[in-house]
């Protein structure tokens, strides 16, 4: 138990689409963490809400001929309902477009302005002459100036993953009509992020949570820290103080929502939000794709405005489906409601799978086959089998619960389990925590199998009674510690044990209180197996969705939409001759640490081996790249990506980064004409 009050938040789901499996990788671990620590006695408030601003929502509203607020409310309600169905119990689930967040955002910004951390600057901004409007964020597409991959607005989401400031994107085109964008002057406001470099380098080493978040942020700050444009020219959003035309950039008001939603909760429950945000710990659960927002932008903004920064940031790994990249456009996605809840599958099964499958920071590869295997082997065969065997034997052989004391060795085993599980939870090692819970059930399974009370019942009923009473104590402990993982199933088990209260009202320490009931409830199998037929039906849904997406893409006239406009700038043969293109062979490939999209390649170009850093890790594995022959620009000025020097550039086509390779085998270093 910790005496400090703690506010735990989860990254805000964006109200421009439905909830999918990737979302749950953040919310279920957050819910588990809160549930477990609360039942250890910690004072925790659990906060989330929906992110309602930004250009994608406006684009959707325009396409659907409705308002951004209406779009936001629709998806807000969807996420709220799905979270409740999945047993994710926030104390407050707010909206960033609600008045409390507008007020808190303006207040924080005004403080930053008053303290000299915000300045005005005229910049070159993309403008569509056909649509007659400036193109903030997702209204513009083009080329990333850092890695050369296709980028959208404020982020290179198909390449190096860098945040892009307004005006940085190269070869900009209007995302709405495809017209080549013009650059026009526009006044915007910048946050002096560069002024916080020393503060961040002092603060980040003290940040708790998962190492992937801390290390990624430190690398980012050490590499470069540019000032941050915090305004956009649009109507939808929080109005920037003193401006009629500008709103705040969505990544300004979105995290402020954590504070605003806590305010709303405090007002509704007669509590103090300052108790948690000023005096307590502040823990953020997020996806690894938004680390720099939460570990760089957010703490700098808070520090500048006089607020306390995050105490810990817990960043989950990404999700793949059957070994393939998660992709909504390609149909490689599992929708939480449509594919899971609407099929009648228990929320507890998915909660267990996502927590138990792998370490929180590692990539989680989802497959229905693995899902079936884990549920059947671990829940049905181990946990459920032990609980059912223990209680059924008591009812059939004794009727009432044997009135003998539980042996000391059983309490010692439970106590060891409780200590190990608590240590894992507080260290954000959720797989280890769930493994610890299952190990206690496995211990019980082994204990009852070795003791075989069904054989002893005739020759030594007292010994059989002792064994079964010991087993009931273990079942009770398992129910209590499994509740944060599987709330509904644990309540059912609790009632089978003869209890009538809510299991969530009991502290974890009750696992060491002797089992006191004299009778058991109605004992039934706790878990149902996932049969092959059901698993095959789920796999068929996924396969059909992927096939339908391919057909849809093939049926469209996609050429104009996908192919970028041909440049109007004319070059000469002399310009082309400046490029020294050579055939290279990749001799070594590895992922760049603390990144999700960068590969570090060692490429033999005939005369030497060079290091090239490329944003293709989401398309090619390091193993796929080794021995591959590629075309390399060898006279390109060296550049740095995430602190790694890149001495050359390879060629790739489209968002899928299809590599340009020689059709015939030619020696390394061969010049391309």
UniProtKB/Swiss-Prot annotation:
CDD domains: Anticodon_Ia_Met, MetRS_core, tRNA_bind_EcMetRS_like. Residues 575-673 form the tRNA-binding domain. PROSITE patterns: TRBD (PS50886). A motif ('KMSKS' region) lies at residues 325-329. GO terms for molecular function: ATP binding; metal ion binding; methionine-tRNA ligase activity; tRNA binding. It is found in: Cytoplasm. Its EC number is 6.1.1.10. The keyword Disulfide bond does not apply. Pfam families: Anticodon_3, tRNA-synt_1g, tRNA_bind. It is an enzyme of class 6 (ligase). Its cofactor is Zn(2+). The keyword tRNA-binding applies. One of its GO terms (cellular component) is cytosol. It catalyses: tRNA(Met) + L-methionine + ATP = L-methionyl-tRNA(Met) + AMP + diphosphate. It comes from the Archaea. One of its GO terms (biological process) is methionyl-tRNA aminoacylation. Is required not only for elongation of protein synthesis but also for the initiation of all mRNA translation through initiator tRNA(fMet) aminoacylation. Belongs to the class-I aminoacyl-tRNA synthetase family. MetG type 1 subfamily. PANTHER family: METHIONINE--TRNA LIGASE, METHIONINE--TRNA LIGASE, CYTOPLASMIC. Homodimer. This is Methionine--tRNA ligase. It comes from Methanocorpusculum labreanum (strain ATCC 43576 / DSM 4855 / Z). The lineage of its organism: Archaea, Methanobacteriati, Methanobacteriota, Stenosarchaea group, Methanomicrobia.
């Amino acid at each position: 138990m910790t005496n400090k009050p703690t506010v735990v938040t989860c990254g805000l789901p964006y109200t421009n689409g439905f909830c999918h499996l990737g979302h749950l990788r953040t919310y279920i671990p957050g819910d588990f963490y809160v549930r477990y620590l609360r039942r250890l006695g910690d004072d925790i408030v659990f906060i989330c809400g929906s992110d309602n601003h930004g250009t994608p929502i406006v684009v959707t509203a325009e396409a659907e001929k409705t308002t951004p607020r209406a779009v936001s409310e629709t998806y807000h309600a969807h996420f709220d309902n799905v979270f409740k169905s999945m047993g994710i119990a926030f104390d407050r689930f707010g909206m960033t477009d609600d008045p409390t967040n507008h007020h808190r955002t303006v207040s924080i910004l005004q403080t930053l302005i008053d303290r000299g951390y915000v300045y005005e600057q005229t910049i070159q901004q993309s403008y569509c002459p056909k649509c007659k409007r400036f193109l903030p964020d997702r209204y513009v597409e083009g080329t990333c100036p850092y890695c050369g991959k296709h980028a959208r607005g404020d982020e290179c989401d198909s390449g190096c993953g860098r945040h892009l400031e307004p005006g940085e994107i190269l070869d900009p085109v209007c995302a709405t009509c495809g017209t080549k964008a013009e650059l026009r002057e526009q006044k915007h406001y910048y946050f002096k992020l560069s002024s916080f470099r020393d503060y961040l380098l002092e603060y980040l080493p003290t940040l708790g949570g998962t190492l992937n978040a801390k290390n990624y942020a430190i690398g980012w700050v050490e590499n470069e820290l540019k000032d941050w444009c915090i305004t956009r020219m649009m109507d939808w959003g929080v109005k920037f103080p003193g401006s009629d035309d500008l709103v705040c950039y969505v990544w300004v008001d979105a995290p402020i929502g954590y504070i605003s939603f806590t305010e709303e909760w405090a007002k509704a429950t007669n509590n103090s939000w300052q108790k948690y945000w000023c005096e307590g710990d502040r823990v953020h659960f997020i996806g690894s794709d938004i680390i720099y927002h939460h570990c760089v932008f957010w703490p700098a903004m808070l520090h500048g405005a006089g607020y306390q920064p995050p105490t810990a940031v817990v960043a989950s790994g990404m999700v793949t489906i059957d070994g393939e990249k998660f992709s909504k456009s390609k149909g490689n996605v599992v929708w939480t409601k449509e594919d899971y809840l609407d099929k009648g599958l228990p929320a507890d099964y998915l909660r267990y799978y996502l927590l138990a499958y792998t370490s929180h920071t590692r990539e989680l590869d989802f497959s229905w086959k693995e899902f079936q295997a884990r549920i059947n082997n671990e829940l049905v065969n181990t946990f459920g089998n032990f609980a059912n065997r223990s209680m059924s034997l008591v009812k059939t052989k004794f009727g009432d619960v044997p009135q003998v004391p539980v042996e000391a060795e059983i309490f010692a085993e439970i106590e060891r389990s409780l200590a190990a599980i608590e240590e894992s939870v507080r260290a954000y090692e959720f797989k280890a925590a769930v493994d610890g819970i299952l190990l206690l059930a496995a211990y019980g399974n082994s204990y009852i199998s070795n003791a075989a009370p069904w054989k002893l019942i005739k020759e030594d009923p007292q010994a059989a009674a002792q064994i079964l009473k010991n087993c009931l104590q273990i079942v009770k402990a398992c129910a209590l510690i499994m509740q944060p993982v599987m709330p509904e199933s644990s309540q059912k088990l609790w009632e089978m044990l003869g209890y009538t209260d809510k299991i969530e009202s009991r502290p974890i320490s009750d696992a060491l209180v002797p089992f006191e009931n004299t009778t058991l409830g109605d004992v039934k199998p706790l878990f149902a197996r996932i049969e092959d037929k059901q698993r095959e039906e789920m796999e068929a849904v996924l396969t059909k969705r992927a096939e339908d997406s391919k057909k849809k893409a093939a049926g469209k006239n996609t050429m104009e939409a996908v192919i970028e406009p041909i440049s109007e700038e004319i070059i000469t043969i002399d310009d082309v001759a400046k490029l020294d293109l050579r055939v290279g062979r990749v001799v070594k490939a590895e992922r760049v640490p603390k990144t999700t999209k960068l590969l570090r390649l060692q490429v033999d170009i005939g005369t030497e081996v060079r290091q090239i850093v490329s944003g293709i890790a989401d398309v090619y594995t390091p193993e796929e790249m080794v021995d591959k022959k590629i075309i390399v620009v060898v006279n390109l000025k060296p550049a740095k990506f995430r602190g790694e020097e890149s001495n050359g550039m390879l060629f790739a086509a489209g968002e899928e980064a299809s590599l340009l390779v020689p059709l015939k085998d030619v020696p390394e270093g061969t010049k391309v004409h």
